[in-house]
Regions:
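Alpha/beta enzyme core
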Residues: 1-172
Length: 172
């Protein structure tokens, strides 16, 4: 984090490259950096190929939103304070801008991503559909803790049936 509270893109990307190489060396078939740093997919792809891991695939978290749906997880692991006053909104996606999502996904594909993630999934099914239709790459949606918490609260209140809603929510 710099003095203005921003995550340092280039330094973070260097760490992500080291992590991806470590996973590939350990035998991972797919690496999936859970971040939104600019240029990280190209750097990871280059490092993997230079190290001979030409078959290691990359799942890019291309559309990772600055979402309140992460709240229960961040509270559970105490990660809200990790940024020391920083804000993930300065590098995660604006929920109101679907065109930015398509642009970011396209950049990651051009840099070498084999598949992409939209996170969280449920509130952004419009993004999932556009990515799949317009960019035609394997597309995954991530159900985060806030989505689970909504379902669990409704189940506990008797508004939804647990098995049915869990199965329905995973059909994306």
């Amino acid at each position: 984090i710099d003095e203005d509270g921003y995550v340092m893109n280039d330094e973070t990307t260097e760490v992500l490259v080291k992590q991806a190489l470590s996973h590939a060396e350990a035998g991972a078939d797919v690496v999936a950096p859970s971040d939104m740093m600019d240029g990280r997919i190209g750097k990871i792809r280059e490092a993997l190929e230079n190290a001979g891991y030409i078959h290691t695939q990359i799942m890019a978290y291309s559309a990772k939103y600055a979402s309140n749906y992460y709240g229960p997880f961040r509270d559970a692991v105490g990660s809200s304070s990790n940024l020391k006053g920083g804000n993930k909104k300065n590098y995660q996606m604006d929920p109101a801008n679907i065109d930015e999502a398509i642009h970011e996904v396209a950049l990651d594909i051009n840099e070498g991503a084999d598949m992409v993630m939209v996170k969280p999934g449920m509130p952004y099914l419009d993004v999932v559909r556009r990515v799949k239709t317009e960019l035609q790459v394997p597309t995954f949606a991530y159900q985060v803790s806030g989505e689970y918490a909504m379902h669990k609260a409704a189940i506990m209140n008797g508004w939804l049936k647990e098995r049915e809603i869990v199965m329905e929510s995973l059909l994306c």
